[in-house]
UniProtKB/Swiss-Prot annotation:
Keyword Secreted: no
InterPro entries for this protein: METTL16/RlmF, rRNA_lsu_MeTfrase_F, SAM-dependent_MTases_sf
NCBIfam families: PRK11727.1
GN (gene name): rlmF
A GO CC term assigned to this protein in UniProt: cytoplasm
Source organism phylogeny: Bacteria, Pseudomonadati, Pseudomonadota, Gammaproteobacteria, Enterobacterales
Top enzyme category: transferase
Organism: Yersinia pseudotuberculosis serotype O:1b (strain IP 31758)
Family label: Belongs to the methyltransferase superfamily. METTL16/RlmF family.
HAMAP family: 23SrRNA_methyltr_F (MF_01848)
Name of the protein in question: Ribosomal RNA large subunit methyltransferase F
Length: 336
């Protein structure tokens, strides 16, 4: 065991009668997800000593971080990215989204399985596989995971110039990302693909974590509920997001349903330039509207991939305009 400050507290806490036994693995995560096991804070602290001041014993006698503290969550992410993905430098502005990495990794792995399902169950790997990350943010989570696990190259877009500046610093400070992640600013806040997707560009898949809420008030109310569940009974009228997030990352007009519906509409113009369009869908109630939009644009194939992280269930919807014959030609040309 590491000799860090909380160790004595840990030893005392471990003798508590209310010591709780947790399962060794988190239920529901993808088999290839590196985060299936419970966090090994000893190992993470070796990789990232900056994490140590944020470690403390829980009421159940375990060591953890305060997930209601944005700085603690940010430092945990920094440690995870360094320990599992070899990211030496990672920093984001204080008000940027700091996503839970296990769930983001699940999206990437299930997306890899989606591609494999069209390639004889073999995951296409390497720099020839190009993905478009809509809303890459300052954190660059999807490109970091996709490059490390499968060698894919990414184009990341965002409307926030400050987020992109932070993302560019992450890219410049990590050699593995320099030639595998290209960043573009979406200058039209009402557009998704238009303006950042050149006519001759082809992508094997797109991915997106769309803004969840329809207003700033709705986003704040959700944060208050989350903090209450984490045991923070006194919550401010404008609470600080424990996972951060600027307005453009958390809400937009029409919320998740409106954003993804616009994405579906725009995807028609790129129908022959992409194999699979995909987007996370957090609300199950959003699905009927998205299915309706996909029927309207006559998508050839639509799939819904369910994912689970413990008790939380999410999914992403994938659609393609390529016929089976066109899919086979795409695979032969780009994935062989």
């Amino acid at each position: 065991m590491l000799s860090y400050a909380p160790e004595n507290a840990y030893q005392r806490a471990s003798t508590m009668e209310n010591k709780k036994v947790f399962p060794k693995e988190k239920s529901g995560l993808h088999p290839r997800n590196r985060h299936r096991s419970r966090y090994d804070f000893d190992a993470l602290s070796v990789s990232c000593p900056e994490l140590i001041p944020f470690l403390a014993p829980t009421a159940y006698g375990d060591i953890s971080v305060d997930f209601a503290d944005p700085l603690a969550v940010k430092m945990l992410n920094k440690a995870l990215l360094k320990h599992f993905y070899g990211i030496e430098y990672w920093d984001i502005p204080a008000d940027s989204l700091c996503p839970p990495i296990p769930g983001r990794a699940d999206y990437v792995h299930h997306l890899a399985d989606l591609l494999a399902s069209c390639n004889g169950e073999v995951i296409p790997k390497g720099k020839n596989i190009a993905l478009l990350d809509i809303g890459v943010g300052a954190n660059c989570i999807y490109p970091i995971i996709g490059q490390r696990e499968y060698g894919w190259r990414f184009t990341g877009t965002d409307i926030d110039s400050h987020a992109l500046s932070a993302a560019k610093m992450v890219v410049s400070m990590n050699p593995t990302l320099k030639n595998t992640l290209r960043l573009k600013q979406q200058k039209d806040p009402h557009a998704i693909f238009e303006g950042v997707w050149a006519v001759n560009e082809r992508y094997d898949a797109t991915l997106c974590n769309p803004p969840f809420h329809g207003s700033a008030e709705e986003a704040a109310a959700t944060t208050r509920r989350k903090l209450h569940k984490l045991g923070k009974n006194e919550v401010a009228a404008k609470p600080v997001q424990n996972f951060g997030g600027k307005n453009s990352e958390l809400w937009c007009e029409g919320g998740e349903e409106g954003f993804v519906s616009r994405m579906v509409a725009e995807s028609v113009a790129k129908a022959q330039n992409c194999f699979w369009f995909t987007s996370l869908i957090s609300k199950k109630t959003t699905l009927p509207a998205i299915y309706h939009a996909l029927r309207y644009v006559k998508a050839v194939e639509v799939r819904t991939i369910e994912m689970a992280q413990g008790q939380k269930v999410s999914r992403f919807v994938a659609w393609t305009f390529l016929t089976p014959e066109q899919q086979a030609a795409w695979v032969a040309e780009r994935w062989a």
